[in-house]
Amino acid sequence: MPVDELKRQLEIIKRGVAEIVPEEELVEKLKKSLNEGKPLRVKLGLDPTAPDIHLGHTVVLQKLKQFQSLGHEVIIIIGDFTAQIGDPTGKKETRKQLSWEEVLENAKTYQEQIFKILDPAKTKMVFNSEWLAKLTFADVIKLASKYTVARMLEREDFAKRFKEGQPISIHEFFYPLMQGYDSVALKADIELGGTDQKFNLLMGRTLQKEYGQEPQIAIMMPILEGTDGVQKMSKSLGNYIGINETPQEMFGKIMSIPDTLILRYLELLTSVPMETINEMKIQMETGVLNPRDAKVFLAKEIITQYHSREAADEAEREFIKIFREKELPDEIPEYKVPGELIDGGVVLLPKVLFSAGTVKSISEAKRLISQGAVLVNQEKINDINFVLKPSKEPYTVKVGKRRFLKIIFEK
């Protein structure tokens, strides 16, 4: 077995990782894999409860991509069966169960996005209903006997809900058991997940031992901070970057992140060599590299992954045009004001912005106006009751730093 190859694989696998349980067993599995020429089976379970993937979700997918590059077997489990329960990890209350149809529709969308990162030819995708739906009640009782309620209540989220008198449904206890059983069904060598999934990943090790298998290695990836640099990236918090967003949206959002996130994003979200990242770190610390230029480099790397190098270059040009030269973008979405919005010959600006989908609510529009974040024809608006009169010429509206709208009154 080439020692250099073992060292190379370990360096790649350990990049950006938060924790490996246990690391010494990983080394032994890799040695055996290299000696026998047999790839390791690397598993990631995904419950398609929310079909839109953002960069936070891609941290584990990037790690899977690295395993693919090393020649190992990558298996994605679409948890169509477990998604009907919903992962209770970190939840304060029982989650609403999805219908089978909702799960399958979400799974289809998930697959399209996953293959923007992973090589479809090297990815095995399976649904865990293939084995979980076939379990008899006797099988389920046998599975449940492998773990105790006391051990389940060691989980922080369950313990907190139990202590506060919040209900915990029995079926929620089955979620980690079923995820662990996935590892048994696949005879997984390695399972990936976020640090918040540690309990579930270790359940896989426990059950594999109970079923007479060699236990898997649990590799935990860190939870990615959102664009605010504080809270985890989340759609509900509005600090996310979706992989289906336009290059312009991606570029603007990445340029808005705190400088402290630049190197972390490069390590976790790109394939830029660590030597390059470490060199950039030194250059930023010594003032040789401006953090703004480092962000441009990061933005173009990420946009190239999900779009193209040409799209990344164009997004940079557009960003410079809007933010440095204070010009308008080449393409601005248009909105034709419907007649029913016009009242007394005028239309309220907050209503138009909401109706056009530029803001999520009329109250958000009013808040942005009162904060001076809305410009009409490059003039700042402060009146929340500002009205637009029908005009032959369109109104150009800028909301915040990155949202633009061309308002047109039909003749």
UniProtKB/Swiss-Prot annotation:
Entry's localization field: Cytoplasm
Keyword RNA-binding attached: yes
Keywords of this entry: Aminoacyl-tRNA synthetase, ATP-binding, Cytoplasm, Ligase, Nucleotide-binding, Protein biosynthesis, RNA-binding
A Pfam family the protein falls into: tRNA-synt_1b
Motif annotated as 'KMSKS' region, chain positions: 232-236
InterPro entries xref list: aa-tRNA-synth_I_CS, aa-tRNA-synth_Ic, Rossmann-like_a/b/a_fold, S4_RNA-bd, S4_RNA-bd_sf, Tyr-tRNA-ligase, Tyr-tRNA-ligase_bac-type, Tyr-tRNA-ligase_bac_2
Gene Ontology BP terms: tyrosyl-tRNA aminoacylation
Residue ranges constituting the S4 RNA-binding domain according to the UniProt record: 347-409
Reported function: Catalyzes the attachment of tyrosine to tRNA(Tyr) in a two-step reaction: tyrosine is first activated by ATP to form Tyr-AMP and then transferred to the acceptor end of tRNA(Tyr).
Quaternary assembly: Homodimer.
Protein known as: Tyrosine--tRNA ligase
Gene name tied to this protein: tyrS
